[in-house]
Amino acid sequence: RKEYDATLPMIFMNSFRTHEDTRAALAPYGDLAVAGLDLGFVQNQEPKLKADDLTPISWPADSGLEWCPPGHGDLYTALTTSGMLDRLLSLGYRYASVSNSDNLGAAPNAAIAGWFATTGAPYAAEICRRTAADRKGGHLAIRKSDRRLILRDTAQTPKEEMDYFTDEF
C-alpha cells in the first residue's frame, strides 16, 4: 500500500471453523481494513462423507462435526454467495490476486496488474518448479479428454498416478 500509494484490500476466505480465530488474530492490526470491506468472508460447507459408500456421516453428539469446508476451490462460489464479489465490484475493484495461505512469499505485483489491464486476460496462474517440500497442493497436468492444461489436486489424482503428483520435476 505504501509503495504504490494504493488502497489494496487484504481479504481472507475462511472456513466456518477458522473465521472467528482469523478475526481475533487480525484485530490488533487496525490498519488492515479497507473502508467498505470486511477482512474476510466464510466459504461454504459440505457434508463429510464416508469413504466406503460416500453417504453423509452422522455424529449425533455434535452435528457440527458432520460438516467440512470444501477447500480453496470454493473461492468463486463463496466470493459470489457471500456478497464479497459485489462489494468489491461496487467499490471499483477489477482485478484480484489470490494466494493460498501456505504461499507466504505471495505479494501484489504492479507488473502483473499492469499486464492484466493491458491484455484484458481473464486469468493467469503463477507456477514454479516443485521442490522436495512440495508434496501436497496442486500440480499441472494435461487432461486426457481434451489435452488441456489443468491444475489437479490430490483428490483428482488416481492412485496409479500419485508418483507424478509428488515428483520434483
Task: Please name every model-derived segment.
Residues 1-169:
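Domain-scale recognition of functional cores that engage charged ligands
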